[in-house]
């Protein structure tokens, strides 16, 4: 209890003041004895995701169509969109905050490389240099309307060592009520006000919460459930009929497409995970036409049907867009689009991840997928403090032999193919 009281004081925006440990002494003893020697810092995000997902009610998430995005899907999106240190980024359905955290990792590595500093494993308690801290504090945001998910993401951000104050408990879709929500909820203000104030600085104009000036947006919005409230539907082009009146209901993910485009500045780019039907159904043609009017379609990457198992077998694709802009993305009618399909399932039919029988440089299992090149050959093990030189040399030799053994680990993946395409197309965010 004393440790928990200290934690509440230190991390006020993660734990409420009146929070109690809701376990009996005997159950608490079992948990502590099992977890006391587990190191979360410098751990594997995949493992931590699996653990933290149990903290979010699975049945309620399933009803909302919300599922944590596998880290390898996140990494593919981040690599393809190539966020920069001077660019702002947001996830409008942030869940466990995978997209923001991995965007931080990607940008931090570029900052360390630029400064000639060797980057350690970034998911650690090690204090980051001021430039990295400033980037997170001013540029990276997450929004989610599931309070448990927000708290989980704050915990993950805390473990990752980045700024968790910009993870906000808000309804991205119902932006008209943000100010009303903030004004009437003192508890909300205590936890989220500073992050909300920074978010407001990125609005296109004051006193409105529709249009923002983000450079990069990545999101995996909930698929299940329709929005039926006419007040909300009336605020969206995709929520109206041809005569201008609100439709009776619209899929939640459909409104997220429009909402996300409104969050981007002209020339801004985004990746959004969508159900495959949005790309194929004849009844969804109006959605595709709306997208083409607002942005350039950069790429469509079909994910394997097992990616979101065991929670759902829904077939999904990732849509990559860049908002039209006279300078960064001049509007045109005829242009090339990158298409790719994930061939390696990454999970079996029961939803268990498929791994290579080898560990990476941080002793983490490597998931078998073809979304990007893992570059294990350039990420060799680091000598441990209590490890002799002989033991270290042996470990490196075994590591190199394993990497050489699995030839498909040497192949470029979908992300690398897109980067080559983007450079050939002279896309603004991949210009050398």
At which residue positions do the language-model features occur?
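S-adenosyl-L-methionine
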Residues: 46-68, 79-82
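Conserved S-adenosyl-L-methionine
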Residues: 66-198, 211-212, 216, 224, ...
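Proline-centered turn/helix-capping motifs that create local helix->coil transitions or kinks
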Residues: 40-44, 112, 222-230
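A conserved structural/catalytic subdomain of Rossmann-like adenosyl-cofactor enzymes
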Residues: 175, 181-184, 188-432
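Short acidic-aromatic active-site loops that bind/stabilize oxyanions
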Residues: 41, 63-67, 245-250
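Long recognition/docking surfaces used for binding and targeting
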Residues: 1-58
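Membrane-interface junctions
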Residues: 41, 76, 80-83, 263-266
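Residue-level signal for short amphipathic helical patches enriched in basic/charged
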Residues: 43, 84, 303
């Amino acid at each position: 209890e004393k440790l928990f009281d200290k934690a509440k004081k230190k991390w006020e925006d993660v734990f409420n003041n009146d929070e109690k440990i809701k376990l009996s002494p005997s159950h608490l003893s079992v948990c502590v004895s099992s977890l006391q020697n587990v190191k979360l810092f410098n751990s594997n995000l995949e493992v931590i995701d699996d653990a933290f997902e149990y903290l979010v009610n699975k049945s309620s998430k399933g009803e909302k169509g919300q599922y944590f995005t596998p880290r390898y899907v996140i990494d593919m999106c981040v690599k393809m969109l190539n966020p920069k240190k001077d660019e702002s980024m947001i996830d409008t359905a942030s869940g466990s905050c995978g997209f923001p955290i991995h965007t931080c990792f990607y940008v931090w590595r570029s900052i360390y490389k630029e400064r000639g500093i060797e980057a350690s494993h970034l998911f650690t308690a090690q204090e980051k240099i001021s430039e990295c801290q400033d980037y997170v504090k001013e540029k990276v945001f997450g929004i989610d309307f599931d309070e448990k998910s927000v708290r989980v993401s704050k915990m993950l951000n805390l473990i990752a060592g980045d700024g968790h104050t910009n993870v906000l408990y808000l309804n991205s879709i119902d932006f008209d009520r943000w100010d009303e929500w903030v004004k009437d909820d003192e508890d909300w203000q205590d936890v989220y006000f500073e992050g909300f104030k920074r978010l407001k600085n990125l609005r296109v104009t004051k006193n409105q919460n529709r249009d923002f000036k983000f450079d990069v947006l990545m999101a995996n919005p909930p698929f299940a459930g329709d929005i039926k409230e006419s007040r909300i539907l009336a605020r969206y082009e995709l929520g109206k009929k041809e005569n201008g009146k609100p439709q009776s209901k619209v899929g939640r993910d459909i409104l997220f497409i429009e909402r996300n485009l409104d969050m981007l500045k002209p020339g801004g780019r985004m990746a959004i995970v969508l159900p495959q039907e949005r790309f194929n159904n004849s009844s969804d043609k109006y959605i595709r036409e709306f997208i083409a009017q607002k942005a350039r379609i950069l790429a469509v990457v079909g994910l394997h049907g097992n990616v979101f198992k065991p929670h759902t077998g829904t077939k999904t694709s990732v849509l990559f867009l860049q908002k039209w802009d006279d300078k960064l993305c001049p509007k045109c009618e005829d242009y090339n689009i990158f298409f790719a399909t994930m061939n390696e399932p990454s999970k079996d039919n029961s939803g268990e991840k498929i791994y290579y029988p080898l560990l990476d440089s941080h002793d983490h299992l490597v998931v078998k997928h073809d979304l990007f090149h893992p570059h294990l050959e350039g990420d060799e093990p680091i000598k441990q403090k209590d490890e002799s030189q002989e033991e270290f040399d042996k470990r490196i030799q075994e590591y190199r032999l394993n990497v050489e053994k699995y030839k498909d680990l040497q192949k470029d993946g979908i992300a690398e193919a897109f980067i080559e395409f983007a450079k050939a197309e002279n896309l603004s965010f991949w210009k050398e």
